[in-house]
Amino acid sequence: MLLSDRDLRAEISSGRLGIDPFDDTLVQPSSIDVRLDCLFRVFNNTRYTHIDPAKQQDELTSLVQPVDGEPFVLHPGEFVLGSTLELFTLPDNLAGRLEGKSSLGRLGLLTHSTAGFIDPGFSGHITLELSNVANLPITLWPGMKIGQLCMLRLTSPSEHPYGSSRAGSKYQGQRGPTPSRSYQNFIRST
């Protein structure tokens, strides 16, 4: 069941759904707008000949921060990681779904490639997979509304929520844009 603005405010007021910093003006009829933080991870195209999800490639990305007050410029065809300004803490009976903003999508900005689902129990900043599919550069301003988070109530609380020892929670507690950790549980078929 998708939560309404009333349900979202009730979950936040009760302390079950944590959002820091929280701004009530960001609550929409059935979602919460999320804002862009000021840190980005850009890919180092000269360090590796290819990306291998089975290997730890520590120098695949570099953390960058625009000069105070300046935007990050995302060029056509580029892909970078960003993150939400807000830190989210989900209870064991709520899951999240990150969606883009329609106005930004109409400019050619994709907010996530595939990872729009947030498990119950997750706590941290949400990493954004930002792509420019337009034919002009797009300026990304820290603090701008970048997406919206919908919350879904589970039919029962999760038995092993994200962050529990059985969940394999490699991104629990992440701060800022976090690079892939696919190598940690990569399985090769024989």
From Swiss-Prot:
dTTP inhibits both the combined reaction and the dUTPase reaction. SUPFAM superfamilies: dUTPase-like. Residues 160-190 are annotated as: Disordered. One of its GO terms (biological process) is dUTP biosynthetic process. The record marks G116, F117 as: Important for bifunctional activity. Keywords: Hydrolase, Nucleotide metabolism, Nucleotide-binding. It catalyses: dCTP + 2 H2O = dUMP + NH4(+) + diphosphate. Pathway: Pyrimidine metabolism; dUMP biosynthesis; dUMP from dCTP: step 1/1. It is an enzyme of class 3 (hydrolase). GO terms for molecular function: dCTP deaminase (dUMP-forming) activity; dCTP deaminase activity; dUTP diphosphatase activity; nucleotide binding. Pfam families: DCD. The active site is at E129. DCTP binds at K101, S102, S103, L104, G105, R106, D119, T127, L128, E129, Q148, Y162, K170, Q174. Residues 171-190 have a biased composition (Polar residues). Its EC number is 3.5.4.30. Bifunctional enzyme that catalyzes both the deamination of dCTP to dUTP and the hydrolysis of dUTP to dUMP without releasing the toxic dUTP intermediate. It also acts as a dUTP diphosphatase. Affinity for dCTP and dUTP are very similar. Belongs to the dCTP deaminase family. Homotrimer. NCBIfam families: dCTP_deam. PANTHER family: DCTP DEAMINASE. HAMAP family: dCTP_deaminase. This is dCTP deaminase, dUMP-forming. It comes from Mycobacterium tuberculosis (strain ATCC 25618 / H37Rv). The lineage of its organism: Bacteria, Bacillati, Actinomycetota, Actinomycetes, Mycobacteriales.
